[in-house]
Structure formats: C-alpha cells, structure tokens
Amino acid sequence: MHLMYFTEQPMSAYDAKEGLKYGATALTFSNKHFDPVAGSRLYGEYLEQYIYAEQVGIDGIMLNEHHNAPFCMQAKANIFASVLAGTTQRVKIVLLGNPLPLAENPIRLAEELAMIDMISKGRLVSGFVRGGGQEQRATGVNPAYNRERFEEAHDLIVKAWTVPGPFRWEGTHYQHRVVNPWALPLQKPYPRVWIPGVISKETIIWAAKQRYPYIALNTSIPQTKQIWKLYDDTAAAAGYQSGPENRGYLARIHVAETEEKAIQNAKQFMWMQGEFTGLAHPVWANPSGYFSPSGRRSFVEFAVGRAKNPRGNPTFEEQRADGMIMCGTPKQVLPRIRHLLEETRPGILAVWGNDGNVSHSDSMTCIRLLGQEVFPQLREWAKELGLDSPFEAEAPVNIAYAKDLKRPVAAAG
C-alpha cells in the first residue's frame, strides 16, 4: 500500500466573517482579504510539515491546486512539487493534480513535469484533473469543452513524453507547429498518472480505459463501491482485471494525543464545507456544459431552492458517525480505518490530516502520529489484505504497455 499525506493548504488567516457576510468565498470574494505576510508564514509551515512527513516515514506527499478561493493556497501545484523535488530525498511527489482544461499550452506543462521528475530523481506521480467549475470561469475557458480539452491535452502530453520530436500537432483545441521538448521525464515510459474524482462516471470510465488508478475523494463506502463496480466492468471490457493497484482513496483523518484535542481540530474539516466560510454559488461551481445534463439539473434545482444539495450537507457529528471524518488517538482511529480498508480495498490511501485553523504545532503532532503509530499498522494490514500499490504490483503505467491483456489493444483511447 502507498500511504501519503495531504492538506488543502488553506489560507486560514483571513476574517471568515467577511466570507459569511459576502455569502461565498470562491471566484468573486475579493482578494483584498488576502494577507501576503500571513501567506508567507503559512507557506513556510506547509513546507516544514511536508519535510517532516518524509522524516517520520510517510510514503508520499499529495499536492493539488485551486484558484480564486482561500480554501487552497496552491495556485500552481508544480511550484510546491518543484520545491519538494529539491528538498526531499525519498517521498513520492503526487500531483492530484494539474487541471488540464485550464492549460493553454500543454507542452509547457509537459516540460515542467519532466523537470520535476528529473530533479526528484524519478519520484513524480503526475495526476490530472478537469478543474473546478468556477475555475473555468476564472480562466476564461468554455466549460462545454472541458472534457474534450482534458483528453486532448493528456494525449498531447503523453505523446510529447514518449515520441521523439519534432512532430506537428493539429488537434481540435491545441495546435502546435513544432513539438520537440528538450525536457523529458526520467521515468520510462513516463511517470505514473493517477486520476482523482468524486462523482463523474465519464472520468471513472476514461481512467479505467487508460488503466490509470482512480482516487476516490472521500466518497462514502457505498459510493466508493459503485465507483469500483463501474471501473471493474470497464476494465474487464478493456481486457484486464482491476484490483487494489487501480484503487485509491482520500480519507479525512486527524489524530492527536487526546480524543478531545482530535475532535476539536477535526471540526476544522467543516471549514472548507462552508460552515465557517461559504464556498461558491452552485451555479458558479457547475456552469452550463461542465456536468452531464442530469447532473447539471440537480445542482440548478438546489440553487433555486427546489431540491436538496445533491452532494448532501451532513453535520460534523453525522460525518464522524458514518466514517467520513475520523478523529481521535491512533488507537481510536485504527479500527475505523481497518473497516474502510476491508470495505473499499484501496492500494493507495491518502490521509487528509489537517485543514482550516489547525495550528502548525497540532499539524506536526498529527503527522508524527500518522507516520509513527498509524501507518506502520496500516502497512501490516495491507499485507494481510493483499492491498498492493501500483509500485508493489508493478502495474503498467498505461494499458498500452500492458502484457496481461485478454485481447490486444492498439492504443489507449
């Protein structure tokens, strides 16, 4: 099992009352509320936490990016990945990920990722995402072409990594007269690609066709089983049997020396969900064309008050009761994690350990307890349950490189 640490890197040093007063904290919430002095301090603390995670034995650091909102300070995941490539020695640098539809030049992105892979001596995992709905608006990208741009940018990046240049690319959304990057990944044929997501069936099917691991982002156990069913069926149709090496899960788990402290800090997971801030208007987050028509309709009905939030709005107590948030001492959370592993069988587990206004000191304590008391037990259970990571299973990077297919595949599509 591959065990990694994650935090959204929240810009928590702003007046949350202003967000509540405005009614949203994404897209149009003014950046006059951003404090660069506090931002500089927070960036330093997050870097210290990542370096400490490596020191206590954590396998990987998961990074992401978001835009125009305080819940995530990473405007470019590749920047922190570059820093970690030069300041760490062992941990995998897992980008989940670069929002491909927002990229106007995928070749530049391919070059950046290749540099990170070389500087880190082959420790990059390059995940790709579609980007949030409001981020399409922020960058001026037509959300109706989101999936087309995602798939075409992916294909162009992979070709730039694997096919010697120069060659020409004349696509629907990207045109390059000369593709010939003089920066190529150290890992061959190219760095592993993992695909995170929540509810998009189209993305699950696409990932399975590519044979890329799919990382379920804190979905419920029943939802996660539905995801694996769709993935497994797609994999079987593509000619291979999927397993734990194709499955990842992001869980919100905060550990502390006492249960009282853990509960106090874990309540900060509600910070991003709008209990303390506000987040985006549903129509901004789900612009026309971004979701399938049925998904779009459910969010619009919610926005105008005709229906409940399709993603639900459970309280902290409800999420703790059903395992969506786990908190306590290591001994208290381990049985709940064991249940999660038995039910969802992931070969990749990302622990979202800290959020909101959790102090730097408490964040470091959580990381220490994860690395020294929680993860060692999880590794033993993973061996018992046969939960191999893609690295342990030596899974192919892409279906195009598979040697175990029940029927030949010309290329991943």
Pin down the residues of each PLM region.
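N-terminal beta1-alpha1-beta2 module of alpha/beta enzyme domains
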Residues: 1-88, 190-191, 389-393, 401-413
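Conserved, mostly hydrophobic/aromatic
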Residues: 3, 53, 65, 84, ...
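Hydrophobic faces of well-ordered beta-strands that scaffold small-molecule active sites
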Residues: 3-7, 61-63, 93-96, 124-128, ...
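An alpha-helical appendage that flanks or caps ligand/catalytic pockets
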Residues: 4-34, 147-182, 223-346, 375, ...
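Active-site mouth loops of central-metabolism enzymes
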Residues: 28-44, 97-107, 189-199, 253-256, ...
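Acidic (Asp/Glu)-rich catalytic clusters
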Residues: 54-55, 81-90, 113, 117-124, ...
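Glycine-rich, proline-tolerant flexible connector loops at the mouths of alpha/beta enzymes
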Residues: 60-80, 99-100, 219, 351-363
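Alpha-helix-loop-beta-strand connector modules within alpha/beta enzyme cores
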Residues: 74-95, 368-379
